[in-house]
């Protein structure tokens, strides 16, 4: 097997995953944009403060990621307390996790495994993501900014 063939073989499942993710997003009846065959930007409706949820269909996982806030907004003195609160939130909201990306933004992330993927699994992953966004903006953001 040539190297090029192996690369093509590695890309086929992701392409299939991309089509699956697109179909599930359509079934959710939500607005989204396609970015080539690599990602989707979902624009959640009603009562959600965030503007975009990025959906990354990969070979093994379909990952949802949202930037929640720029951590440069936080006072440097209170960051340790903020990080502790985020770790506790990770323990409370086991379906999702909070993290920090390369641009120093607080992110929310969760994923569904491609193996055994179904519309119900994808929908549960999406709903958990929305619930965590709501939790962050209703219960955490103001507290974090006060630290």
Which stretches of residues belong to each language-model region?
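Charge-rich, low-complexity N-terminal segments
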Residues: 1-50, 92, 101
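Hydrophobic residues embedded in beta-strands of well-ordered beta-sheets
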Residues: 38-40, 62, 105-106
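A short acidic-to-branched-hydrophobic micro-motif
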Residues: 51-72
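Short, internal acidic amphipathic alpha-helical interface segments
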Residues: 65-105
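Short amphipathic alpha-helical signal-transduction/dimerization elements
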Residues: 87, 91, 130-141
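Well-ordered alpha/beta subsegment
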Residues: 95-127, 138-141
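Short, highly charged C-terminal tails/helix-capping segments
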Residues: 141-147
């Amino acid at each position: 097997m040539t190297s090029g063939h192996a690369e093509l073989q590695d890309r086929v499942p992701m392409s299939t995953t991309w089509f699956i993710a697109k179909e599930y997003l359509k079934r959710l009846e939500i607005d989204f944009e396609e970015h080539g065959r690599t990602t989707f930007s979902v624009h959640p409706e009603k009562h959600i403060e965030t503007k975009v949820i990025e959906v990354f269909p990969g070979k093994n996982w379909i990952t949802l990621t949202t930037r929640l806030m720029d951590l440069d907004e936080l006072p440097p003195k209170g960051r340790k307390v903020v990080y502790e609160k985020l770790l506790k939130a990770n323990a409370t909201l086991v379906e999702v996790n909070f993290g920090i990306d390369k641009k120093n933004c607080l992110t929310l992330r969760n994923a569904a495994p491609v193996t055994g993927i179904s519309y119900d699994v994808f929908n549960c992953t999406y709903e958990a993501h929305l619930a965590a966004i709501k939790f962050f903006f209703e219960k955490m953001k103001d507290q974090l900014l006060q630290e």
